[in-house]
Amino acid sequence: MNFEGKLVGKDLKIAIVVSRFNDFITTRLLEGAKDTLIRHEVEDTNIDVAYVPGAFEIPLVAKKLAQKGEYDAVITLGCVIRGATSHYDYVCNEVAKGVSKANDISDTPVIFGVLTTESIEQAVERAGTKAGNKGSEAAVSAIEMANLIKQIN
């Protein structure tokens, strides 16, 4: 038997956790995610958005939403841009670990859509210009994973 998630969002309920820090980027990621979900037939009323202060706070809220059992997938969106200190490394590592742990505690897929870039230019490129929109890509992954989990269950 083969399992493959379809890219049809009809009847899916999706939560998005988005960081307000670097909102000039995260707003574009959110727009890309919502647009993609709607284009794949997810009803606007089935998309809930939770705003958190920064990327570090994303995993806790993603975990709580996944544990509720009300959503078919949770998308995480944020942007961490390297600065002059090691703060970047700690935040990136902890956010990635936290989102991974959120996947371990529920049957709800939690999708990692947090940009970790070396520069503002790289972030802008990944938020809807040269390198596409990573929010949109995260939405496609969420739809596919939600449908895949439904098939397996």
Curated annotation (Swiss-Prot):
Active site per the UniProt annotation: H87
For this record, the Gene Ontology CC terms, alphabetical, are: cytosol; riboflavin synthase complex
Q: Which Gene3D superfamilies match?
A: Lumazine/riboflavin synthase
The EC number on file is: 2.5.1.78
Molecular-function annotations in GO: 6,7-dimethyl-8-ribityllumazine synthase activity
- Residue positions binding (2S)-2-hydroxy-3-oxobutyl phosphate: A84, T85, R126
What keyword terms does UniProt attach to this protein? Riboflavin biosynthesis, Transferase
Q: Which GO terms describe its biological process?
A: riboflavin biosynthetic process
User: NCBIfam families given for it?
Assistant: lumazine-synth, PRK00061.1-4
The record's similarity note reads: Belongs to the DMRL synthase family.
Q: What is this protein called?
A: 6,7-dimethyl-8-ribityllumazine synthase
**Lineage of this protein's species?**
Bacteria, Bacillati, Bacillota, Bacilli, Bacillales
